[in-house]
Amino acid sequence: MADPANDRSEREEGGEDDETPPASDGNPSPSANSFTLSNAQTRAREAAQDLLEHQFEGMIKAESNDEGWRTVVEVVERNAVPDTQDIIGRYEITLDGTGDVTGYELLERYRRGDMKEEL
């Protein structure tokens, strides 16, 4: 009678790789589902439009951290003529590792024509 612990012929012939166990919860590893910079930019843009209800102007910063992503976006809070008098709001939007919004905060407001130091 063959010792199952020492009989590897069935596993080797079947082509199955039993060397690497599957994830304990059956889901792919986090690295396989990592939330990329491109995903973070898209999600922050959507969040800015949905949560702030203003016209998205642009993203000026996106950086990853241990919890997910920190982004800084600008939205047009008030249109004016001339457009140099538009009021721009600069917001920080934080996302977790799956892209869910965990918070947002107004950093500052300024007129488009004012010179601003970039973050």
Swiss-Prot record:
Compositional bias (Basic and acidic residues): 1-12
Note: Encoded in a 14-gene plasmid locus called p-vac which produces predominantly short, spindle-shaped gas vesicles during all stages of growth.
Biased composition (Polar residues): 26-42
Family (UniProt): Belongs to the gas vesicle GvpO family.
Lineage, broadest ranks: Archaea, Methanobacteriati, Methanobacteriota, Stenosarchaea group, Halobacteria
Oligomeric and partner information: Forms homodimers, forms a GvpN1-GvpO1 heterodimer, interacts with GvpC1 (via the latter's C-terminus), GvpF1, GvpI1 and GvpL1, might interact with GvpA1.
Protein name: Gas vesicle protein O1
Short name of one Pfam family: GvpO
Keyword Cytoplasm: yes
Keyword Coiled coil listed: no
Cellular component, GO annotation: cytoplasm; gas vesicle
Protein purpose: A minor component of the gas vesicle, also found in soluble extracts. May play a role in transcription and/or RNA stability and in GV assembly. Gas vesicles are hollow, gas filled proteinaceous nanostructures found in several microbial planktonic microorganisms. They allow positioning of halobacteria at the optimal depth for growth in the poorly aerated, shallow brine pools of their habitat. Expression of a 9.5 kb p-vac DNA fragment containing 2 divergently transcribed regions (gvpD-gvpE-gvpF-gvpG-gvpH-gvpI-gvpJ-gvpK-gvpL-gvpM and gvpA-gvpC-gvpN-gvpO) allows H.volcanii to produce gas vesicles. A minimal gas vesicle can be made in H.volcanii by gvpA1-gvpO1 gvpF1-gvpG1-gvpJ1-gvpK1-gvpL1-gvpM1; lack of enough GvpJ1 prevents formation. The same region restores gas vesicle production in H.halobium without the p-vac locus, but it still has the c-vac locus.
